[in-house]
Amino acid sequence: MGTLQEYDYLWFFLVIASIVPILAFTISEILAPIRSGPEKLTSYESGIEPKGQAWIQFHIRYYMFALVFVVFDVETVFLYPWAISFHSLGISAFIEALLFILILMVGLVYAWRKGALEWS
């Protein structure tokens, strides 16, 4: 089997992965009815009639907390496999994980000093 033939599966996957979303959006545009009106501009409250304005502004602090949460949630996802196979990885993996945690701690201290974690 030649080297180029090994990449045939990759090219096939990339072509299919490109065609499927385009096809899904195209079929949706063709088949979906286009209805506009005041009901389209209201928020959906699980079948309950919404009260008040549908368009409100959220305070930027919510986004800052969400951003910090996402960063440390992703950190957990990356560190879990490392912790599971800690004994078999060796010292280089330990140093890399330590460097990763150190970089994230620098980011946490930066966010803390900028006041991103204060709610006042």
Swiss-Prot record:
What residue range is the signal peptide?
A: none
Q: What class of enzyme is it?
A: translocase
Q: Keyword NADP on this protein?
A: yes
Q: Which GO terms describe its cellular component?
A: chloroplast thylakoid membrane; NADH dehydrogenase complex
> Which membrane topology describes this protein?
Multi-pass membrane protein
Q: What is its main location?
A: plastid
Q: What is its EC number?
A: 7.1.1.-
Job of this protein: NDH shuttles electrons from NAD(P)H:plastoquinone, via FMN and iron-sulfur (Fe-S) centers, to quinones in the photosynthetic chain and possibly in a chloroplast respiratory chain. The immediate electron acceptor for the enzyme in this species is believed to be plastoquinone. Couples the redox reaction to proton translocation, and thus conserves the redox energy in a proton gradient.
Complexes and interactors: NDH is composed of at least 16 different subunits, 5 of which are encoded in the nucleus.
Q: Which family does it belong to?
A: Belongs to the complex I subunit 3 family.
Q: Per its UniProt record, what HAMAP family does this chain match? A: NDH1_NuoA (MF_01394)
- What is this protein identified as? NAD(P)H-quinone oxidoreductase subunit 3, chloroplastic
Which lineage is the organism of this entry classified under, starting from the top rank?
Eukaryota, Viridiplantae, Streptophyta, Charophyceae, Charales
Gene name, per UniProt, is: ndhC
